[in-house]
């Protein structure tokens, strides 16, 4: 199975992501690589540990937007919920959603890292 098939199996809407880029698979893969770098440098969980919710909102917004652009559906949906909860002053609930998505996110990120050509 190639990278895109593996991502599909994880719930990523690869076909929609490619459609957004007019079918340019090379560009899609390059942007997936950029997303990995962003996730590694923009981790939201430390902000929760330090009660830095303004910072968490900014990072979550960036992750949500990029995940949406790439149709990384599980990540996009979770960060949409996290943002909504943080913006309505529900950090405990947002942290619970983050805890659920982090293993899924890590699986997707690891898959991308391991399968980049």
Regions found by a protein language model. Give the residues of each.
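Long, amphipathic alpha-helical coiled-coil segments characteristic
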Residues: 12-62, 92-116
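C-terminal compact regulatory domains
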Residues: 1-2
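Short, well-ordered alpha-helical segments
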Residues: 55-57, 67-87, 97
